[in-house]
């Protein structure tokens, strides 16, 4: 089973504290730093499409890709309620990104890039993002920091809604720098009993130096890194980093 196949229908309820509007506001603030006007946006690994839909509502022409068909099903349903032009959703894994024409900006939020656990995949993803960015465009993404993922070793977390209950168990390997999430999801069915699903998620802890190297190899010239939703450099105990990489004109 692919990551988020079972969780897709419950994801929005379980992740209700994702601060999506605040993140969309922050993305727009970074759009204003672009050397070219931002009209078209690619949301890479869009999940259930919340950020993509918020940006579409604000007038951007949005393409959104994800590797999970189940997550995209939720995204398409969400977009159907929008006024105006909805995002164009495409079923694509990040290292297989392919568009019809370049876009002004590429975004990827909520640690999607951490799910690329192999160097070959993250390098290919950065190369393809660079390929499909217009000259002068920017690539904005966030990652969970090594500090955060290392601290998650041996932890257990629980989320619940009215009709679902989720237990996350996390384990971090210092050898592979991979944090494994074992997820048990219980959902209330029509008969008043609970159905159980299990998924395993894996996130790689990439260092700032590694990500800067991969971006430079892909062709990006200017890279800035800040803490989460701030213009300041990351603290040593920062949980999330935001990268902004620019393509030369």
State where each predicted segment sits.
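A short glycine-rich, Lys/Arg-flanked "PGG" loop and its adjoining helix->strand segment in the class I
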Residues: 123-135
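C-terminal lobe and adjacent flexible extensions of AdoMet/dcAdoMet transferase-like proteins
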Residues: 202-249
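A short acidic, Gly/Pro-enriched loop at the edge of an enzyme's catalytic core
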Residues: 98-105
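Class I SAM-dependent methyltransferase SAM/SAH-binding core
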Residues: 42, 50-96
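Conserved S-adenosyl-L-methionine
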Residues: 45
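SAM-dependent methyltransferase
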Residues: 140-213
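Conserved class I S-adenosyl-L-methionine
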Residues: 1-39
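Residues lining the SAM
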Residues: 109-111
């Amino acid at each position: 089973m692919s990551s988020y196949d079972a969780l897709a229908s419950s994801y929005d309820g379980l992740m209700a504290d994702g601060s999506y509007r605040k993140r969309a506001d922050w993305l727009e603030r970074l759009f204003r730093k672009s050397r070219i006007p931002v009209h078209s946006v690619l949301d890479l690994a869009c999940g259930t499409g919340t950020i993509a839909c918020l940006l579409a509502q604000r007038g951007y022409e949005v393409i959104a890709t994800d590797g999970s068909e189940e997550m995209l099903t939720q995204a398409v349903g969400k977009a159907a309620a929008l006024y105006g032009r909805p995002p164009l959703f495409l079923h694509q894994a990040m290292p297989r990104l392919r568009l019809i024409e370049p876009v002004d900006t590429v975004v990827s939020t909520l640690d999607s890039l951490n799910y690329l656990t192999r160097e070959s995949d993250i390098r290919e993803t950065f190369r393809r993002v660079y390929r499909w960015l217009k000259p002068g465009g920017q690539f904005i993404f966030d990652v969970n920091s090594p500090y955060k993922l290392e601290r998650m070793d041996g932890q257990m977390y629980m989320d619940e809604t009215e009709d679902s209950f989720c237990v996350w168990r996390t384990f971090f390997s210092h050898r592979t720098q991979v944090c494994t999430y074992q997820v048990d999801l219980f959902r209330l069915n029509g008969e008043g009993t609970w159905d159980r699903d299990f998924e395993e998620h894996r996130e790689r802890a990439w260092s700032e130096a590694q990500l800067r190297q991969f971006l430079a190899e892909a062709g990006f010239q200017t890279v800035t890194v800040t803490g989460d939703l701030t213009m300041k450099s990351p603290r040593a105990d920062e949980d999330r980093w935001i990268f902004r990489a620019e393509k030369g004109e």
